[in-house]
Amino acid sequence: ASKGNGRGPYVQADLAYAAERITHDYPEPTGAKKAQLSTVSDYFRNIRTHSIHPRVSVGYDFGGWRIAADYARYRKWKESNSSIKKVTEDIKDNYKETKTEHQENGTFHAVSSLGLSTIYDFQISDKIKPYIGVRVGYGHVRHQVRSVGQETITVTPKPKNGTQGGPVKSTSPIPAYHENRSSRRLGFGAMAGVGIDVAPGLTLDAGYRYHYWGRLENTRFKTHEASLGVRYRF
């Protein structure tokens, strides 16, 4: 222990590497709805991405256990998908080709997380203190998707009497689909790490935390974070 026999208020700054995971938790669509993009969570149902972000905490050290409030902001994740589908039909004296083009753009942003933690320190030496803790967090997530497209129909006459007529094309837009959601959820997590006292009142902190953000529509969102930071006790 250092200042105040290890007791007192403290501030902490961390740089965290977060692995963000979204998994869908509902039956796959079938029948007429199988090819339908119906909700934002359909689009973002299997995210595997990561971000590096800062985190700040303020807390109080009771000399064996701590409480802390923390705040973090995350990186916006973007994705674009495009698809082309062609269908050719033989209709009487013509060949009809229907080409459907789709362009989908989406963003997913774990905007912020505000949490409250209870942490227990194990003092195995004067300077090294492993710890474990639990966290309750209030998370804000925004996600949106926009889909646009067009349909091109090409009608080509079949050869008749040795002559071949030219193709006739017509293009029409597909109504745009846009959805924007903002979700706020209460989630729970756990943490573990080690603190190393490097100077009176100054501790180097290396830790891991898991946080379950809760359900977003029909998906589950969670993060795994590894962090490195410094803690200063007043």
Swiss-Prot record:
Main location (coarse class): membrane
Location(s) in or outside the cell: Cell outer membrane
Q: Which family does it belong to?
A: Belongs to the opacity porin family.
Domain of life of the native organism:
Bacteria
Sorted alphabetically, the Gene Ontology cellular component annotations on this record are: cell outer membrane
Give this protein's Gene Ontology molecular function annotations: porin activity
Which residues lie within the region annotated Disordered? Answer: 154-179
The record's keywords, sorted A to Z, are: Cell outer membrane, Membrane, Signal, Transmembrane, Transmembrane beta strand
Taken from the record, one Pfam family name reads Opacity
| Organism taxonomic ancestry | Bacteria, Pseudomonadati, Pseudomonadota, Betaproteobacteria, Neisseriales
Q: Does the keyword Heme apply?
A: no
Transmembrane listed as a keyword: yes
TM segments?
A: none
Q: Which SUPFAM superfamilies match?
A: OMPA-like
* Database matches in InterPro entries: OMP/PagP_b-brl, Porin_opacity
Official protein name in the record: Opacity protein opA65
Q: What does this protein do?
A: Implicated in a number of adherence functions. OPA proteins are implicated in pathogenesis and are subject to phase variation.
Give the signal peptide as a residue range, or say none if absent: 1
